[in-house]
Design a protein with these regions (language model features):
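Residue-level signature of catalytic and energy-coupling elements of molecular machines
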Residues: 35, 51, 70
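Flexible, active-site-adjacent loop/turn segments at secondary-structure boundaries
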Residues: 21, 30, 55, 60, ...
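Short, functional N-terminal and low-complexity linear motifs
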Residues: 4-10, 54, 78-84
Length: 138
């Protein structure tokens, strides 16, 4: 299955588990908001440490705005493959499309590692470039 259009970068498999773990720890020792609306508010207010967005959300328009406003607000964000697993990591029995970590609690070191890894992934891939640089005529 192809990735949804709102997924801006690929998350390596070895990073998915630490993302879920950071959520579990932050739920117990910090402060986490659940759901797309709460994540949106956290981004707009500038209080989020990390935004987690599920890739398998239907319809994709539910969460498609999150990466855009994260970029505008310079908020850290990541993607996880499953809304079901995102819900489990949050300690709820239902699916969840997005979550925002507001206070990382004891998960700060995990979140710092995740954010550093994501920064490397994003830096390694030019964003918003539609044409190869070889086409320059100078």
């Amino acid at each position: 299955m192809a990735k949804p259009y709102y997924v801006k970068f690929e998350i390596p498999e070895n990073l998915v588990s630490p993302i879920y773990e950071s959520l579990r720890v932050a739920v117990e020792t910090g402060k986490v908001k659940r759901g797309t609306n709460e994540a949106t508010k956290a981004i707009e207010r500038g209080v989020s440490k990390l935004i987690i967005i599920a890739e398998d959300v239907e319809p994709p328009e539910v969460v498609a705005h999150l990466p855009i406003i994260c970029e505008e607000q310079k908020a850290a964000y990541v993607f996880v493959p499953s809304k079901q697993e995102l819900g489990k990591a949050l300690g709820i029995e239902v699916i969840c499309a997005a979550a925002a970590i507001l206070d990382s609690g004891d998960a700060q070191h995990i979140i710092d590692e995740v954010i550093a890894s994501i920064a490397k992934i994003k830096d390694g891939k030019p964003e918003a470039k539609s044409e190869p640089e070889a086409k320059s005529e100078q």
